[in-house]
Amino acid sequence: MGSVVISLDAELGWGFHDLADPPTERVEAGRRGWSVMLELFEEFDIPATWAVVGHLMLDDCDGVHADHPAPDGWFDRERTDWADRDDLRYGPDLVTDLLESDTDHEFASHSFSHALFGRPETDREFAVAELERSREIAADWNESIDSFVYPRNDIGHREVLAEQGVSAYRGRSPTRDGVRGIFDSTVRDRSMLVEPAVDEYGLVNVPASMFLFGFEGPARTVAESIWTDPMVELARSGIDEATRTDGLFHMWLHPNNLTHERDDHRMRAILSHLERRRTATDLTVETMADVARRVAGPSSATERATASWS
């Protein structure tokens, strides 16, 4: 029995706060995309793993975070360019919409402030603080964290995840994005299915199969004008492959990728195809936590979570 996972990196402005020149269109699209994706998931009753930046769950802060061991200047944009942009720094309204959705989504972590765990400047102290603060805020919302999505897929400090009671993380995709990925998957007929596995820390690595917005710009416009949306075709192919096998197809995106209506159409086409295949076959839709329980069993995550709070 094959399965499909969809994970989202829910970050608003935090996904770009460390960049010298953040992409304005995507920064401004975060709230819109969040709401559109929730509506589409509810329409097709498809659960997903939403990895949320913990800072979004705050109502207010001083913009300094003096007790947080981040590198110098890490929170500067909060006090400068975005000092008057609460809509980019906070999102308790959006998180409430997520948690109150009729669809059974998984609430997961994307760190507290979009820290890049694989970078040299992210030392163990910083990584621990990012996880601890995220868990504390989640607990204030009566939520727990089973899954973690590394900001920018920059993997590091996996031992910290295990110590903090996390059971699963999204691993890197074995396939490539963009034109090269389309070539590999179509011309070379390379499988997009992935195999989750327990790593040396007892965490379940749930690798990504496909970034749903890896083929954009002029190339996308040309492709759509003479053929169709290549990413929709690839996603359908991956879903169909999972339907025929016992494999896992794992798609991911950011809400801020939905900058225009054509992006909404892409997601509607993919989700409607997934819903049809799920209805007609024994294909299942899972969250990352579901996969972790299936692969490692429910006891391992419970034991880690208990140990981390003791």
Where does each model-flagged region fall?
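Catalytic alpha-helical scaffold of carbohydrate-active enzymes acting on polysaccharides/glycoconjugates
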Residues: 1-204, 228-251, 259-310
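Active-site clefts of carbohydrate-active enzymes
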Residues: 203-221, 254-256
